[in-house]
């Protein structure tokens, strides 16, 4: 946030301002003449802060009730205008705010929906010494109580680096420090946010909306469209796949009937929003693609022509979007359309405007870095194309918002900071001309509070020293343990760049030999001892100990995942996993299965049954053994104890088929490798059987998959791909079948306890 002193009233900065003394005050707070919901919330914060700091209830008055009292003026009022010689916000930009003292009076004001709120927050933090580095889920803001409050004169004027900010989850802390998007009534209620938590835009739905407006099946879509089932009545509204078939995955934006129906439904939605609106905020309508289907929207001839016309895979979509927004601009100027620049096969690549066509300025493009290597910045060659496309978008429109990502799925449980990437990419986004940056961060423990704090500080001022924000956070959050906490944070930050495999956004499982190899046995052991010392230093300070152990949580989860290796290398230290588990506590339900599986593997013991005798003829260093992972997002068991299994446990096959199929696939080259189909005569139920899959050739992104109905049980093998070396192996798979479908009794189930690869040196 760019700040400077007002030199025009620098002569007023002499002498302390006594706000309260001996439980009394001579000050009144002057409310805005026409307070909004946000202003009422801001006033409440100001009153609470002054009460916590001084113990005094400051009286609140309106302009007509002001006499000659000393005063704190919040926002624009007749009193503030008279005192300051005119409307104080007239010269400000949107969201710019000023906090200043003039003689003994104080003025807190800003422009736009949240301007006054930002003025109050600045005053509480910088003049009253409020300490608050995390959201209220962890800790309430704190003031050092005083009997006499005298503050130095001040004058600050600030404007955020980014106009719009958003994290993956809302909170009072995030809202007060700049989270100003996607705060619908439902979200605010669901997160327990108070009255006065309001978005800049009225944006009822955020993302992945095309099927809300054109639902393929009855029961989907907005409430007023749930009786529609467009795929049955109008299959031509949906994209054509490469085989020439219409499929309900995306829309066919070149189709005139689709365009007409989609526009009608969008305008109906706008009408319904207006009917229920209680304010004058602009309306934001999201229109973008469905998430699961990652290929081109449509392969029909008309869409292909528009793809060439705009030199973008989504040419037909942009052609429709430009027509829609051109009409809206003339008929409903307060309506914005928000779309996403998402995936290179879809909308990430900006269109080339044909001769005479201009990209409308009522379109917001949320540019998503979903395909980046997320532990590397846009300065890295592997992510350079993402930044190049961002700059292309910024040349088309000033309304580009960058959507940056953290980790998903099981990866979210691991110690991972990614602060340098966040800081560098935010600065590069600002330099490219982005209007906003949002971070999809989830409310887990570990590094989340730190990341949200640094993100919000950088959103205020991208040029600020992000490392100093880390230090400030640690001092506030970890007290006497701050120095060691900061040391741990920097070591994780450095180590996380050294994984053996590039780190993607989604990690259904944690590969300690690949992207998460930086969580080595030695690193985990060293870091656990750091936390022992932090807890010793925090003895008697329950607040600090709580925060230290919240930071420790992700390390404890990683410790569970590597327990056998840790207990073997450090037997005197890692003696009882239940002590570690007891510290972890609550885990997000969607990721609790990972922790459950790891505990089961600990209980299985450090078992390793020998290979069959037929493998004795191979050199030991040419044989690799693995266990696949079931990454399905359901409540079914992913791992089961089995005393006869190679390692004492086995992975369940998600949604197994019959005949049972499994095989090898090169994901990066989209090439199917060897496969096997097992019929009843090939299966002996209730015992382990080894099947020779055949020869496979590894690539950087490849897998062995199970069940043609799912593939969600698989073994990713890109981590052992070696450039400039032989990557040919012979693969064997150990399976156990049970249940009626496979010739046994009871519920049908397929287990895999071991995949064996033998390196083939023959070319």
Where are these regions (language model features)?
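Feature activates predominantly on carbohydrate-active enzymes
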Residues: 41-45, 49, 90-322, 329, ...
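Substrate-binding cleft/loops of secretory-pathway carbohydrate-active enzymes
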Residues: 338-370, 413-418, 445-452
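Aromatic-lined carbohydrate-recognition surfaces of secreted/lumenal glycan-active proteins
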Residues: 285, 321-350, 400-407, 437-439
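Short, surface-exposed tryptophan/glycine-enriched loops
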Residues: 683-729, 757
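Acidic, contiguous N-terminal accessory segments
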Residues: 1-98, 146-155
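Structured mid-domain segments that build the active-site/substrate or prosthetic-cofactor binding neighborhood
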Residues: 257-260, 268, 384-483, 487, ...
